[in-house]
Amino acid sequence: MCLAVPMKITRIDGFAATCEAKGIAREVSLFMLQGEPLDVGDHVLIHVGYAIQKVSEDEARSAWELFDEILEHA
């Protein structure tokens, strides 16, 4: 099973980006989404350092709400 974490793009430099979620920033590769138009402020799913899918802000928020609920009951 794979887990992808939704993050918001805060900086783009070619195929590299800085993404943020829950106060944590990470450098990620946009290489796998090179055919997708991406801008600062967009949300993407991150898996092992790669953005693998663009998602809406609502989808990202829903995922984090689910993660928070799971952690609350862990």
Predicted features along the sequence, with ranges:
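SH3/SH3-like beta-barrel fold
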Residues: 17-21
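C-terminal structural segments of small proteins and small subunits
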Residues: 43-74
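Conserved hydrophobic positions within beta-strands
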Residues: 6-9
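Beta-strand/loop nucleic-acid-binding surfaces
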Residues: 25-35
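Short nucleic-acid-contacting surface segments enriched for D/E, G, S/T with interspersed K/R
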Residues: 34-45
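Anionic group-transfer/hydrolysis microenvironments
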Residues: 22, 31, 49
